[in-house]
Amino acid sequence: MSIDASSNSAGVSLSERSPSVPLGQALALWSLGWSVGGIVFGGVIYALSSTEDGTGTLTLTAMAVASWTCLLVALWTACRMQAVDFRTLFGLSFRWIDLIGIPVGVLAQVIVVPVIYLPLRAIWPSTFDSSALEETAKELVDSAGGWKTVLLVLVVVVGAPLVEELVYRGLLQRSASARLGPVGGLFVASIFFGLIHLRPVELPGLAVAGLVFGIMLLRTGRLGASIITHASFNATGIFALLLFN
């Protein structure tokens, strides 16, 4: 990971000329990493978790670390198979301009996603009620406290944006874009990103958030801006719940 002070003066997305993993291979590696980390190890951790903790902060952290580890192994395997270094294959670099992702993430959380739900709530008020949308996050915040709150913030604001952007933008969006074109890859990866969270009520918002993160990659060809945007998006949501819950 590096901070590069230079700029992309040509205005051409680097993803269009950077190496990528073949889409079928990318999906196979993701599937293996997600299944082993999320289903196998995650299931074991959940089964062994204490009744008091339930799906609280400690269990969430352990499950997240297990899932992230397996996904990172999948990314490392992709690098070995393509004989390309990690930074180059997934576009992992940062520039100072990527800090624009901070206000973009905030705006996406407080304006863009809520606007998406307005027509959905008008048509299906009970399904897309705000309490249903916030249910999972509120449960996590309620289970935290003291040092567990710090741990929750690290998981949500640091770990999740870094690993998820590497996987869903660095691996899958770049691979899908090589096969389907930049716009096709953007939409496919964004919808996929919403689906894998396995909460239908959150699918529209997460897919739109994925579009925002993906556009940052598409515009820069690097993950720096998308990671910062994702972190800002998550931070806005979690701190709002911590302050107003």
Per-segment meaning from a language model:
Residues 50-53, 91, 121-129, 175-183:
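Membrane interface segments of multi-pass transport proteins and intramembrane proteases
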